[in-house]
Structures are given as structure tokens and as C-alpha cells.
């Protein structure tokens, strides 16, 4: 029996021997394809090769591609754990031909692998072909020797693949494995085809046509091959299993969750272990590829997956975060094939632990509310969709968790009502937004773009230029001219002014004509390539068609260039120090400062920030040229350029490289390489200096770094130096000795605070004359009772005071009430261990709380705490406890 890792290796080795380039799995976040949330098939990374937009140095390839299907139309989330073959994460084995071999060789390679290399019984295999594909039908007979009844013609779209409404397409041929007549189900195309007897293990797509229009289809000049075989499915067949969750990989993960929870994967607990095993895989791989839990987009899908697993961990009785404890088992199983798991293990572990800790309160609250709302429902009933939406909207409880929690009771959810409630909320939000004219104005820019074309940007090479005024916009309408004092927007045929984008704010400066002068206060990009200059007419007037001289504020642009280049250096330094999971989540490049948001699950240490800053300044000191090049996005990514994956890039992109790497894989190579349309310094030395001034959280899994460069950084350091000198003078020490003096003062303060606390405790235990129950312990029904109203003791110190009281009694009950400055009271009751079977501290403290005007109280039988608003009744509270003790 072959293990999953061996099956994967055999597949890749087989195709390597047969002349295929073995290509590594692409990330789960598709590169340069905003139409996909996640990579969901092996052909995704070759999409542009198939369409002819990209050339590769090989014509045949094979991959083991990691895939996720948990969003959009490919959403298996609800079924995962409850069926034999649904997964959120899976591996797709595939071989590809880009105009090289076609049907005959593809069928031959597939048949030889599964029958000769994997050793599957040919008698258990049958295939399907598209109903008009006589060529494939004949080839299966010729190569595999299959009889006509084991080559099934299918007329549906199941056996015809298309990339979209237009583009490459072609017939498919699927290979099925027969698990035997002891399992219900019929062959594909039969009335019983939805049964589990015949399972598809491999799909061969023959791309031989191009769809031109809905009615027109032509032959491709170079037909291609795209195949996909689910690793988990073929492993189940090879290991003699009918259920994917019974293969060796899943057995190892489930064994880890059994050990961690102490609950066997049996009966109604079986599905929970399966959910956890599957969701651990998708969560870990998504985090390794730079996705972090959030409330939108890919991050929200990840959060839903993680929270569903965490809910099933709770069903298994886990009271502490569980998934991070299972991570070593996953890394042990898959880390060799996917080294990114090993590289990101610390990040994955930290993210899993943090998310589960945060979610526990939401889960508990949501489950309680769900239980209340569904108490009167029976099997077959529908849970109210509006209530489900309230759980989601108000309490952060996702719909799929509601569905999953109710599934065990046989209760469905009215998803139509849920969707209607969500749409209604969105409509109300739109109606409540009064707006300020921006939406109406936006249409003008598209109209001007269509009329005049895109603005030519000259600002990479110059900060001054000549142009022609094409349009003047005032108050949302196009006008012919503008006079002194008017605020307008100008569109010109070309400009050196940078329009705000990529985090860099727009340029300011001056525009002059023969008849007037304008101050440019901002520049924005509008209407797909239109640069809009926001201006005030300072002198004379201006009109459409006039020639104009445009001059950018040079000093301000210089600061912007330095700050933008510094963000690139900081980005790379952060990735070096924290890990390759760090990705840009937002930025602000302003003239006076820079701000950079990155994906990272926890606060950075002072040491990490120090190293990041030192690395960036190291590159600045090199004073090497900053190089910009234009190239295709695929060439840029092949060179290691960082991009905002998922963004749509044009055929040509601008790549900015700076610095010389000094260590590791960067040694001898450019330090930072990014796709960027912003303006940058000519050499790294022009940045002058970078100083990180703060690091903070802006959301779950996102940290913000703020920094200064050049003169602003030097001014900041000067101010800090002055503060240290002022502090040193106040402390009467040299600046170098400030830290030591402050530490000594803090130690002295802590010592005095401890002494003060101990003195207060002794005073309280000795009696301070403020209680109405006497200073000494009393005997109540054979139990020694010490009750006091204490002053000057913080509520947080009452418990330790009560512990001291118990020790002084040896055996008995202690009750203390402290009153704060605002008149509120805190009460604590402690019972020695020998009496807890007779007397409960929880019961007694509730009596005290009631006397103080409070409600409840809680704790353990030996120690409980409560409070109340009426500190004036503190002595009564002590006597109330004494009375309750007397019975």
C-alpha cells in the first residue's frame, strides 16, 4: 500500500521520465487573476499559456497543485466532514501539453501510469468521452483495449470543458474506478450515477477548439492537454479505501486530534474530527501563502474555515485552543512536499492560537443565543433566516456555523430570508448615505476620458512640462473658463503631476497660462487614466484650449520620493525579519511621513523593529542606483518582484529595484524588487535616513509601521535627544545614565508599594476600628468567623488579604468588605478547606452582595468575590454573612 507522499512522488517522477517539466505548485492566492478567490485547479497557473498570452521555456509540464474550494461557485464547506470526498483543501495532480502532444499520447500516459505504475486492476476501470468525440472513443479501444460498454458517451457539459464564454475549449474524457457491487450506484450516464460505486479519479481535457461567439467555434492551431487527478481520491483507491478520510494522511491528522481531545473518532464525533483535519490543512496552507483572518475577501473565507473547525473542537470538549496543537502532525505529513509549511510554522501556530482564543467568546455567546432561538423547533423545521442574519450581523456568528450547529437536529435555515435581510441592510445603508456629489461627479471623468483619452504622465522624467487645457470642471459640471478665486479641476493632455495612487498622495504645485495662474492643491486619478488637477485660480482667468506651463512643488516631491522608496526598503526588511508571510495591506506616502500596513499576527518586538530599521538604513548607506524597468508582469514575478496578488495588471508593468542584498538568498541580488507606479529617488542615498517612530495594530492580523525619512527623521532624532538631556538634568545624571537612574527609581517605587500593601494588610487584620463587628474572630455555631470592613485596600488585594486571614484562623470563615473612594464596595469571603463541605463561600458572598445593593457574586467554595453600589452598608454586609453562617 502506497502512502500519499509516495503516490505524489511516483506521479511526478513518472512524468519527469516522460519528458515533462516538473513545475512547483503555485500559491493558493492566484497571481494576476482577480477573477479567482483561490487557486482551485492545476491549470490556473498555466491559464495565460493556454490562451497564448504567455510563453514558457517548456511545452509539457506536470504539477502537484495545492487547491482550495471554499468560496464562490466552488464552495464545498457545508459538506466537508459529512461526506467521503468533500474537502476545502485538496491536491490536484496534473500533466499539461501546450501544443505538444495531444489525445493519443495523453491517453497512453494516463493509462500506463494507473495500470502499470500504480498497478490498478484494468477490469475495474471505465471511461467516459464526449458523445461526438469518436477519436477519443477509438483511442481508448486501441490503447487500453476497453470494450465498447466500458467507454461511455456523455452528451452533457460534464464532458465538455470551456474556459469561459469565449476562448479555448474542448471535450473531456474521465476515468472512473469501480469499487464493487457491494456499494450502491451505477456507471456515469445511468439513473444511479450519483451513487458511490463508480468514482471519477482522473479527468483529461482535450483543448482543440476556440469559442469565438456563442454560435461560432473554430479549431485551435495548436491543440493542448490539461488533466487533473485528485490525490486524495486516487490515494483512497490505491490504499483500498472507499473514503478519502481513511487514507494515511487523514488517519495521522485524526489520530492527533483524538489524542489532543481524548475523544475517539466514532459515532457522532467522527464528523468533527474530519472537519478539524480538513480545515487544519486549508487554514495552514492559506496562512503560509499570506492570507490572514479578517472580515473581508480571502481573509473572511479563512476565518469562516477556522471558526467552523473551532466549533467542532468545542463539540469534542476542547476548552483551550486546539488547532495549533495539531499543526506539528500536519507539518510532519506534508512539510517535505511543501516547505512553505515548515517556513511559516511559527506564524501558522500563532495565528491559529490567537484566532481561536478570540473566537471562544463569540462562539459561546452565539451558541447560547442559537439554542434559545431554536428551542421550539423540531426535525425538519426551518430556522428563521432573519434571526440567523442577526446572529451574523450583531454577534459575528457566520451563517455556515448556524447551519452546521442545527444540522445535528435535522433543522435547516431559511437562507432566502437570510439573504433578503442582508440585502435590506445594504439598501438601507445606501439610502442613509446622503452623499456629497462625488458619485455624480465621477461620471464626468469617464465621459472626459472617452472624449480626450488618458493623460500622458511625464512625471517620472521631469517636474515641469507644457500642456494644453482640455477641460475645466466646476461644481461637477464642465465649464469653458474660470476666474480668480474659483476652485476648479483641470484636465490636460499631459502632466508631470503625479495622481494619487499606490498609497502615494498627489502632487501639488503651480499651473500658469498667458492669462492666469493656478495653485494646484491636489492631483487625483479618475476615470481610468485621467489625471485631474484640483486648483484655485490665484490670478487672472483660464479657459479651455489654452497652453499651460505645469510646475510640480520640487521640495515636496523630493520628500515623497524618499518616503516611497523607504516603504520598499521597509517592506523587504520586514519580510526578512518577520517572514515571507508579510504582505502589504495598505500604505500612505505623504511628504511629511510614511505609513505602512502589513500582514502579521502579533505586535513586533523592540528588537525586531530595531533590526528592520538597521537593514533599511544599511541599504540607504550603499547609495546604489534605483533602477526602473518596463516588462511583462510574468517576467517581473519570475524575477521575484513583489506584487499585490489578485490585482489586475496590464500587459506591461513598471518594476522598481533598489539596493544590493548582502545575506542569504538576496546576496548579490537586488535587495528590493517591486511592481510600482510611484515616484522614487535616483539612488538609495537620497533617502538620507529612515527612522521607525511607531508600530501598532489596525485590525486583526494587520500591523502598522510609521516612519520618517531625511530631514524629518533628523529633526525627530534631535527632539528625542533634547528630551533625554532635559530628563538627565532633572534626574541629575549624565544622559548615558538616564536609563539606570529610572530603573533604580522604579525598583524603589515597587519596593515601597509592596511595603505599603503589607502594612495595609497588617492593619486590616489587626482591626482598624471601622467595623461594626469587633476586631477579633468570633465563634458562630462552632465555626470561627473573622469579619472586617477594611480601608485603604484595593479590591484586587482583598483575595490575598482573605488568604492571610484564613492562615491566621487555621480553620474558619473570613469576610472582608472594602469601600472605594466613590462609595462602591467589594466583598470577599474565604472558607478554609476543612469546612467547604459544610459552608460555601459563594453562598455567603451573595448574602454580602445583597446587603450592599448588588446582585450575585461568584467564585469557588473556598473563595468568592462580589460587589455592590452601597459602601455605606459595609458593616451590615459583614453582619449579614455572620447571620447566614449562624443559620
Curated annotation (Swiss-Prot):
Per the UniProt entry, what is one GO biological process? negative regulation of DNA-templated transcription
Where does the UniProt annotation locate this protein? Cytoplasm
Q: Which Gene3D superfamilies match?
A: 2.40.30.130, 3.10.310.40, 3.30.54.20, 6.10.250.550, Bira Bifunctional Protein, Domain 2, Threonyl-trna Synthetase, Chain A, domain 2
Fill in the domain comment: Consists of three domains; the N-terminal catalytic domain, the editing domain and the C-terminal C-Ala domain. The editing domain removes incorrectly charged amino acids, while the C-Ala domain, along with tRNA(Ala), serves as a bridge to cooperatively bring together the editing and aminoacylation centers thus stimulating deacylation of misacylated tRNAs.
Q: Does the keyword Cytoplasm apply?
A: yes
User: GO CC terms on record?
Assistant: cytosol
* Classification lineage: Bacteria, Pseudomonadati, Pseudomonadota, Alphaproteobacteria, Hyphomicrobiales
* CDD domains for this protein: AlaRS_core (cd00673)
The note describing how and how many cofactors are bound reads: Binds 1 zinc ion per subunit.
Full protein name: Alanine--tRNA ligase
What InterPro entries does UniProt report for this protein, alphabetically? aa-tRNA-synth_II/BPL/LPL, Ala-tRNA-lgiase_IIc, Ala-tRNA-ligase_IIc_anticod-bd, Ala-tRNA-synth_IIc_core, Ala-tRNA-synth_IIc_N, Ala-tRNA_ligase, Ala_tRNA_ligase_euk/bac, DHHA1_dom
Q: Where does Zn(2+) bind?
A: 564, 568, 676, 680
Amino acid at each position: 500500500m502506497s502512502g500519499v507522499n509516495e503516490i505524489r512522488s511516483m506521479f511526478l517522477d513518472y512524468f519527469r521520465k516522460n519528458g515533462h517539466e516538473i513545475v512547483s505548485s503555485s500559491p493558493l492566492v492566484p497571481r494576476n487573476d482577480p477573477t479567482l478567490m483561490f487557486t482551485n485547479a492545476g491549470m490556473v497557473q498555466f491559464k495565460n499559456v493556454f490562451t497564448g498570452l504567455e510563453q514558457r521555456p517548456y511545452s509539457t509540464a506536470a504539477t502537484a497543485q495545492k487547491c482550495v474550494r471554499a468560496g464562490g461557485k466552488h464552495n464545498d464547506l457545508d459538506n466537508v466532514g459529512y461526506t467521503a470526498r468533500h474537502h476545502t483543501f485538496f491536491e490536484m495532480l496534473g500533466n499539461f501539453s501546450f501544443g505538444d502532444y495531444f489525445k493519443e499520447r495523453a491517453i497512453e500516459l494516463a493509462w500506463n501510469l494507473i495500470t502499470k505504475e500504480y498497478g490498478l486492476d484494468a477490469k475495474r476501470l471505465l471511461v467516459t468521452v464526449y458523445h461526438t468525440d469518436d477519436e477519443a472513443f477509438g483511442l481508448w479501444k486501441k490503447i487500453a483495449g476497453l470494450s465498447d460498454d466500458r467507454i461511455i458517451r456523455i452528451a452533457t457539459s460534464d464532458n465538455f470543458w470551456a474556459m469561459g464564454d469565449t476562448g479555448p475549449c474542448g471535450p473531456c474524457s474521465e476515468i472512473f474506478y469501480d469499487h464493487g457491487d457491494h456499494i450502491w450506484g451505477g456507471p456515469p450516464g445511468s439513473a444511479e450515477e450519483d451513487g458511490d460505486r463508480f468514482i471519477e479519479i482522473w479527468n483529461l481535457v482535450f483543448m482543440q477548439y476556440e469559442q469565438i461567439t456563442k454560435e461560432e467555434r473554430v479549431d485551435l492551431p495548436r491543440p493542448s492537454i490539461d488533466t487533473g487527478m485528485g490525490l486524495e481520491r486516487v490515494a483512497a483507491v490505491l490504499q483500498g479505501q472507499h473514503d478519502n478520510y481513511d487514507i494515511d494522511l487523514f488517519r495521522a491528522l485524526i489520530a492527533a486530534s483524538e489524542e489532543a481531545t481524548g475523544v475517539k473518532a466514532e459515532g457522532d464525533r467522527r464528523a468533527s474530527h474530519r472537519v478539524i483535519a480538513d480545515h487544519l490543512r486549508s487554514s495552514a496552507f492559506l496562512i503560509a501563502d499570506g492570507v490572514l483572518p479578517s472580515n473581508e475577501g480571502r481573509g473572511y473565507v479563512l476565518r469562516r474555515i477556522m471558526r467552523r473547525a473551532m466549533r467542532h473542537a468545542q463539540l469534542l470538549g476542547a476548552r483551550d485552543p486546539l488547532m495549533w496543537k495539531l499543526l506539528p502532525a500536519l507539518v510532519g505529513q506534508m512539510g517535505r512536499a511543501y516547505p512553505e509549511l515548515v517556513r511559516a510554522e511559527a506564524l501558522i501556530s500563532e495565528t491559529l492560537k490567537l484566532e481561536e482564543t478570540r473566537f471562544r467568546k463569540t462562539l459561546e455567546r452565539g451558541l447560547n443565543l442559537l439554542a434559545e432561538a431554536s428551542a421550539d423547533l423540531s426535525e425538519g423545521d426551518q430556522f428563521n433566516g432573519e434571526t440567523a442574519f442577526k446572529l451574523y450581523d450583531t454577534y459575528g456568528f457566520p451563517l455556515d456555523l448556524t447551519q452546521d450547529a442545527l444540522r445535528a437536529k435535522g433543522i435547516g435555515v431559511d437562507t432566502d430570508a437570510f439573504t433578503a435581510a442582508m440585502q435590506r441592510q445594504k439598501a438601507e445603508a445606501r439610502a442613509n448615505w446622503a452623499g456629497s456629489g462625488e458619485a455624480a461627479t465621477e461620471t464626468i471623468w469617464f465621459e472626459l476620458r472617452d472624449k480626450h483619452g488618458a493623460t500622458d504622465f511625464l512625471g517620472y522624467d521631469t517636474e515641469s512640462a507644457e500642456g494644453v487645457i482640455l477641460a475645466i470642471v466646476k461644481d461637477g459640471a464642465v465649464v469653458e473658463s474660470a476666474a480668480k478665486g474659483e476652485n476648479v479641476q483641470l484636465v490636460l493632455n499631459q502632466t508631470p503631476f503625479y495622481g494619487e495612487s499606490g498609497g502615494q498622495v498627489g502632487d501639488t504645485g503651480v499651473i500658469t497660462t498667458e492669462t492666469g495662474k493656478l495653485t494646484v492643491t491636489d492631483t487625483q486619478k479618475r476615470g481610468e487614466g485621467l489625471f485631474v488637477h484640483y486648483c484655485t485660480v490665484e490670478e487672472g482667468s483660464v479657459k479651455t484650449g489654452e497652453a499651460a506651463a505645469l510646475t510640480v512643488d520640487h521640495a515636496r516631491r523630493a520628500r515623497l520620493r524618499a518616503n516611497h522608496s523607504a516603504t520598499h526598503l521597509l517592506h523587504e526588511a520586514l519580510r526578512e525579519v518577520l517572514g515571507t508571510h508579510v504582505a502589504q495591506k495598505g500604505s500612505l506616502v505623504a511628504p511629511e511621513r510614511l505609513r505602512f500596513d502589513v500582514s502579521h499576527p502579533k505586535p513586533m518586538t523592540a528588537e525586531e523593529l530595531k533590526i528592520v530599521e538597521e537593514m533599511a538604513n544599511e541599504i540607504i548607506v550603499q547609495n546604489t542606483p534605483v533602477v526602473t524597468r518596463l516588462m511583462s508582469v510574468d517576467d517581473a514575478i519570475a524575477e521575484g518582484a513583489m506584487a499585490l496578488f489578485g490585482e489586475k495588471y496590464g500587459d506591461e508593468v513598471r518594476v522598481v529595484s533598489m539596493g544590493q542584498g548582502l545575506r542569504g538568498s538576496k546576496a548579490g541580488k537586488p535587495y528590493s524588487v517591486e511592481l510600482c507606479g510611484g515616484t522614487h529617488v535616483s539612488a538609495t542615498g537620497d533617502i538620507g535616513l529612515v527612522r521607525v517612530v511607531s508600530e501598532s495594530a489596525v485590525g486583526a492580523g494587520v500591523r502598522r509601521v510609521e516612519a520618517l525619512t531625511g530631514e524629518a527623521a533628523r529633526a525627530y532624532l534631535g527632539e528625542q535627544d533634547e528630551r533625554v538631556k532635559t530628563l538627565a538634568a532633572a534626574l541629575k545624571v549624565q544622559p548615558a545614565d538616564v536609563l539606570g537612574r529610572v530603573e533604580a527609581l522604579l525598583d524603589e517605587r515597587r519596593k515601597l508599594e509592596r511595603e505599603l500593601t503589607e502594612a495595609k494588610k497588617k492593619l486590616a487584620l489587626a482591626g482598624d476600628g471601622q467595623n461594626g463587628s469587633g476586631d477579633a474572630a468570633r465563634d458562630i455555631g462552632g465555626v470561627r468567623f473573622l469579619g472586617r470592613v477594611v480601608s485603604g485596600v484595593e479590591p484586587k488585594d482583598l483575595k490575598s488579604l482573605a488568604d492571610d486571614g484564613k492562615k491566621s484562623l487555621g480553620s474558619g470563615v473570613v469576610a472582608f468588605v472594602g469601600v472605594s473612594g466613590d462609595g462602591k464596595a467589594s466583598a470577599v469571603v474565604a472558607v478554609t478547606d476543612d469546612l467547604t463541605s459544610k459552608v460555601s463561600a459563594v453562598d455567603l458572598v451573595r448574602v454580602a452582595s445583597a446587603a450592599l445593593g448588588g446582585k450575585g457574586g461568584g467564585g469557588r467554595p473556598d473563595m468568592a468575590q462580589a460587589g455592590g453600589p452601597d459602601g455605606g452598608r459595609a458593616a451590615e454586609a459583614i453582619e449579614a454573612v455572620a447571620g447566614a453562617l449562624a443559620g
